[in-house]
Amino acid sequence: MGMSDIMWLDVSWAWLVLTAVLLAAAVFYLYTLILSHLAKTTVRNKVVLITDSLSTVGNECAKLFHAGGARLILCGSNWEKLEALAEQLTSQSDPTLTFPPKLVELDFSDMESVPEVISEILECFCCLDVLVFNSSMKLKAPVHSLSLQMDRLLMDVNYFGPITLVKGFLPSLISRRSGHILLVNSIQGKLAMPFRTTYAASKHAVQAFFECLRAEVQEYGITVSTINHTFIKTSSSIPKDEITARSMKTDHRQTPLGVSPKDVATELLRTLSSKKKEILMARWVPKAALYVRSLFPNLFFAIMAARVSNTVAETPDD
């Protein structure tokens, strides 16, 4: 093979790589356009309520739905942060194509205030089109170290809060014979892990409630969807110079098994369009764990017990 043949091969490979890169860029651009159009057609002019809109997932949902022209009801426990979020949304959007969001202070740890919140929202909006239940309180600790007061608090935030809210809005949804209820839930609603007793219990409870609700309201034209995700990837609170192999094991926000808040928000939008009933956002390891739990329960129990033993062995004495 002569020098000219080698140069010709190099040029051919360069053109092949360039074509592949341009094709990938074109596909990504087309995907972005389709997603943008989907947002506009799916939530345009619809009244959308988002609980815990101050969380990472809630924030991404607010951005995506606001850009799509939804009439947002943003709920959160901190009024100042809600105002800051609303200011951010309105300053970054075209006022002729979007609506200023309605802000509602909502804290599921104060269950006595929830009926007032329901009345306030129904007075402002006679009906709701989409309800996104995104509130969640996380806790990881040995069961013997948790007080009953903490157990009740987790159940209020993760279970009693969402079901109280959905019961308050359900009569108006049934009377209109339309609506879409979305539960953003953890994979712990399907798979219980050690050191997350009350958290997993609350997620199992709310998962079961919404699955029963789905069957009961289908005849009224109401769709109920559940999205079970693995760990949400966010910026770690551990300083870079203090990150160790052990902290990487326990700080799940750094693990490659997690999903990004933006991915969850995008999946919510797709679900609104497709009306899919159940979505599992997980990599192959969590999915495999679900199958092992169903098909080989004794093996799963042994693995979980071994994980507990390893955790105890790695814990240094105080």
Curated annotation (Swiss-Prot):
The organism's place on the tree of life at top rank: Eukaryota
This enzyme's EC code(s): 1.1.-.-
GO cellular-component term (any): extracellular region
Binding positions for NAD(+) per the UniProt entry: 49-73
Gene Ontology MF, one: oxidoreductase activity, acting on the CH-OH group of donors, NAD or NADP as acceptor
Subcellular location: Secreted
Enzyme class: oxidoreductase
Listed GO biological process terms: intracellular calcium ion homeostasis
Positions annotated as active site in the UniProt record: Y199
UniProt cross-references to CDD domains, sorted A to Z: 11beta-HSD1_like_SDR_c
Binding locations of substrate: S186
Keywords linked to the UniProt accession: NAD, NADP, Oxidoreductase, Secreted, Signal
Signal peptide stretch: 1-32
SUPFAM superfamilies on file: NAD(P)-binding Rossmann-fold domains (SSF51735)
Keyword Lipid metabolism attributed: no
Function: Putative oxidoreductase.
Record-stated family: Belongs to the short-chain dehydrogenases/reductases (SDR) family.
PANTHER family listed in its UniProt record: DEHYDROGENASE_REDUCTASE SDR FAMILY MEMBER 7C-B, PTHR44668
Name of the protein described by the UniProt record: Dehydrogenase/reductase SDR family member 7C-B
Gene name per UniProt: dhrs7cb
